[in-house]
Amino acid sequence: LRILLICPFFPPENKISAVRVAKFAENWAEAGHEVRVLTRETPATGLAEPHHSNISIHRAQDPFARLAPTAPARLAKRRRLFAIARALYSRALSLVWPDLFRSWGKAAQSLAMDDTWRPDVVVASGGPFTALRVGSKLAKNFDVPFVIDYRDLLATSTYYQFGALRHRLDMAVENRIARQASLLATVSDPLAEELKISYDRPTVVVLNGYDPNDFKNLRYEPKPGPLRIVHCGWVRPDRRDPGPFLRGVHQLLQESPELEIEVDFYGPPPGTVLRLISELNLERVVSYRGQVNHATSLALQAEADALLLLLWNDPGERGVFSGKVFEYVGADRPIIMTGYESSVAAELISQNDLGIVTNDSQRIASYLRELANEKLTTGKVAGPGFPEANEYTRDVQSQHFLNAIESAISPERHSSAG
């Protein structure tokens, strides 16, 4: 197959969404298919690009991407800039339809149409909404099947942030685009069911998964001293509340001051974490370490005694299956999750004894005490072990998606050939 894979997020941009799309490209290329990636130019770094003779990467200009800061700054300045940028982003997002990737979308569409290369299928991974619009138009232009990979839901998402009038517009346009697709993919059963009901199209679940190769040279080699907890990624005060966990740490130290613990946060500046550190007098044990590249993030996860996963405590989170969950599975360290306790992520952790899922600070304190005492006694914290982990690899999930694509488009290709 000649596959046109569309997403503005792609390495070297260090995002979980870019990891998912890059692994699709890599695995499909390994399977012998020609993959052309249509993405954006970006000054971002931190994630290794896939290199394979069957992959070609085509980048269209994106004015928004060029505005991203690339130079390091002092921590206080970086926090201020991050807060300002986030506010400006939210404001701009509300004024531009369908989203801030609109200019990139036009450039990407022109770039693809000016080329003589012709795909057998167009696969668009979204959001943003623009990626779906570009995919829809190019599939029509080339008269080939169209497939949508919903990493997140869009107009039907619980995260939808705009008003009623715009919501009606987005719903109408997305309905038209989604019903054009031969296949819809998404990351969990609950989201797949929503898509099926909304758009009445064939749907497949393609988990984010993890890549065992990312961890093959990484080992858990515990260092003497405190129990070390690591969090990698965004901390959003409105959706990923660190409060229950940090209050659990505070409670542990109040009840068992002799125990040693160290908590490190890596990622964009987490203002709410810094505020709570001060309020709870946790400066001695909780630190913000800044942003790191993807390879370093994986190493930090593998070296930690346990990992912290912050998700939204809301029923709308039921079907959200972050790629970070699977990286943590690959690291084989105990997971401490806060958020919606009936979500698919919570079920994966609870049903497979991969750690603890709770928003109760007392339970968190008790669990941390168990881990700290285990390390004190044995010199390490045992990994949970997960016999079924192979089902959750990127290879397996990418092949599953590829099989579904081939099955979905086969009748259309035969019809077109006839």
Per-segment meaning from a language model:
Residues 1-65, 183, 203, 252, ...:
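N-terminal subdomain of nucleotide-sugar transferases
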Residues 4, 221-239, 246-247, 397:
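Conserved donor-binding/catalytic core segment of Leloir-type glycosyltransferases
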Residues 23-24, 106, 110, 130-133, ...:
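Membrane-proximal helix-turn-helix segments that form the acceptor-binding/catalytic region
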Residues 39-107:
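A conserved catalytic-core segment of Leloir-type glycosyltransferases
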Residues 48, 65-71, 210-226:
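Acidic anion/phosphate-binding donor-loop and adjacent secondary structure
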Residues 190, 209:
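Carbohydrate-associated surface elements
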Residues 236, 240-243, 293-300, 307-329, ...:
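Nucleotide-sugar-dependent
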Residues 256, 260, 267, 272-298:
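Nucleotide-activated donor-binding/catalytic signature segment of Leloir-type glycosyltransferases, i.e.
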